[in-house]
């Protein structure tokens, strides 16, 4: 607040992506979002709003957007990334004289038009703004212990779905990169040894994971995994869980030999 010469900062908690989609907001500004990362019906619900899309390529969002504003790709602008150690790594534009404007420039122009200026006409000015704030040297929150979440009760033919995204998968930024996709991990379903015995399957046999929404059928791998759990990649070839099952994780699913 001091760095920006204001009395206080907003204290209200913002809306999550799901809350924004389900809200009565008439217009939304979206940049770098794949609706299939949110929910199976996200695209349908967003299509009912006035969507302004900041994009570098055609996507599911540009298909439903009322306005599409092309923005500069990383190679066309300067900027910075923060690595896993929290260190800022700056970079400069590799392609000079690009016709596309940076996303911060477009955001600043939109803010000016709606009467809420942020005064960040360039990436450099945004960088200066961030650096003026400096590092936090105030009180830090205490680490508190959290109780373990109880394991859901499941039947003999059921399991709790566990899932995450592989580094190389069906992510939208990997579209068209067939050679890169060829190095991705194969899609598998991971089950415990006891579940494999119950199902009567061996390594690489097909196993079907399903719910009332849909199903995924993949070769199985038997591993040291919690007996009540089954693992499936979240967004890989033949295993796009939001699209196929309508869920991503921690849901009860049926598991059977295919």
Please tell me what each predicted stretch does.
Residues 2-99, 105-117, 121-258:
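A cross-kingdom feature strongest in bacterial/archaeal respiratory oxidoreductases
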């Amino acid at each position: 607040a001091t760095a920006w010469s204001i009395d206080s900062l907003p204290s209200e908690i913002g809306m999550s992506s799901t809350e924004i989609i389900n809200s009565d907001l008439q217009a939304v500004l979206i940049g770098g979002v794949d609706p299939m990362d949110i929910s199976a019906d996200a695209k349908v619900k967003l299509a009912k709003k006035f969507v302004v899309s900041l994009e570098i390529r055609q996507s599911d969002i540009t298909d439903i957007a009322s306005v599409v504003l092309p923005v500069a790709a990383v190679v066309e602008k300067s900027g910075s990334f923060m690595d896993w150690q929290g260190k800022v790594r700056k970079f400069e534009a590799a392609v000079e004289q690009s016709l596309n404007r940076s996303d911060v420039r477009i955001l600043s122009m939109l803010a000016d038009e709606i009467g809420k200026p942020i005064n960040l006409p360039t990436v450099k000015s945004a960088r200066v703004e961030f650096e003026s704030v400096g590092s936090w040297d105030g009180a830090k929150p205490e680490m508190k212990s959290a109780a373990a979440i109880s394991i859901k009760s499941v039947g003999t033919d059921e399991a709790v779905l566990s899932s995450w995204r592989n580094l190389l998968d069906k992510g939208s930024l990997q579209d068209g990169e067939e050679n890169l996709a060829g190095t991705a991990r194969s899609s598998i379903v991971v089950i415990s040894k006891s579940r494999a015995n119950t199902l009567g399957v061996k390594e690489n046999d097909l196993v079907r994971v399903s719910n009332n929404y849909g199903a995924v059928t993949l070769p199985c791998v038997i591993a040291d995994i919690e007996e009540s759990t089954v693992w499936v990649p979240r967004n890989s070839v033949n295993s796009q869980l939001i699209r196929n099952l309508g869920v991503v994780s921690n849901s009860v699913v049926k598991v059977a030999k295919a």
